[in-house]
């Protein structure tokens, strides 16, 4: 408990922690060596002053050191959002992940249950019949079988149990809202990352560069969504081979129509699962368009599309010819088969 005091004392002066100090602080937190009072004070000191890149990188290093790792193809990617945008849209990144996988890109999706919305990635996938909470071997088997796999934060970041109560009691965003997407258990180097605030796009790009990412698009809708949005412009900060650049995209760039924000609202896991399945069954809707836009952006990140219009064409084709629906079916089957105790390691067909 005493080891946290010097670090808290430094934060109390308004000073920032070095990367090494941040790693030390989060090591203590993840070991359960911080009292509830110390943890709450630490998180709010960072929040009020504003987390630095060194503090984020140091925190991620501590998370990555403890996570249950997953072996994935070198070209695997993640499509994920920070959450916390307050709009409770349906599960755009989850559907985009299925579409992108259907286009031949391995997707190792990392996610959680809902925090600020009614339905997080774990919630909607469970409603669709996907087995959640698989261990590393089971995830690897499903990734090989279906081309997509889901890694739950609870299963792969057990150390987070030490902060769950404090986060719930604080009831506000903390550094943990942005750490999860930076600590993918499969160590992916390619990401489409939705961010809840425009001000975080550049800092997170710099953090991901320091953490070794190859190509990432960080996106924030001008309407506030932590997705590429179809209601208007989306702000993008792209990291590619160490270079960072900022630009905007619009739905028209992908040949898509604009939508009203109300048309993108989600609901319960059952509601969102039904909406997702309707898109996979070919129903034209604003839900389909925003999923296509995000899939198109992800396909650019994956090196499979030269621009949004080509990416949108590939994504739409994967829906219309049934490949995306087939990908979901394969994931449901593979995840349930992989979790059977009698199945030998690596035998998920």
From Swiss-Prot:
The protein's Enzyme Commission number: 2.4.2.18
Co-factor remark: Binds 2 magnesium ions per monomer.
Reactions listed under catalytic activity: N-(5-phospho-beta-D-ribosyl)anthranilate + diphosphate = 5-phospho-alpha-D-ribose 1-diphosphate + anthranilate
Enzyme class of the recorded protein, top EC level: transferase
Cofactor: Mg(2+)
Pathway: Amino-acid biosynthesis; L-tryptophan biosynthesis; L-tryptophan from chorismate: step 2/5
Annotated residues for binding of Mg(2+) 2: 226-227
Protein residues bound to anthranilate 1: 81, 112
Keyword vocabulary terms for this entry: Amino-acid biosynthesis, Aromatic amino acid biosynthesis, Glycosyltransferase, Magnesium, Metal-binding, Transferase, Tryptophan biosynthesis
CC annotations in GO: cytosol
UniProt cross-references to InterPro entries, sorted A to Z: Anthranilate_Pribosyl_Tfrase, Glycosyl_Trfase_fam3, Glycosyl_Trfase_fam3_N_dom, Glycosyl_Trfase_fam3_N_dom_sf, Nuc_phospho_transferase
Binding site for Mg(2+) 1: 93, 227
GO molecular function: anthranilate phosphoribosyltransferase activity; magnesium ion binding
SUPFAM superfamilies membership: Nucleoside phosphorylase/phosphoribosyltransferase catalytic domain, Nucleoside phosphorylase/phosphoribosyltransferase N-terminal domain
Binding residues for 5-phospho-alpha-D-ribose 1-diphosphate: 81, 84-85, 89, 91-94, 109-117, 121
UniProt-annotated binding residues for anthranilate 2: 167
Oligomeric and partner information: Homodimer.
Family per similarity comment: Belongs to the anthranilate phosphoribosyltransferase family.
Function of the protein: Catalyzes the transfer of the phosphoribosyl group of 5-phosphorylribose-1-pyrophosphate (PRPP) to anthranilate to yield N-(5'-phosphoribosyl)-anthranilate (PRA).
HAMAP family for the chain: TrpD
Name this polypeptide is given: Anthranilate phosphoribosyltransferase
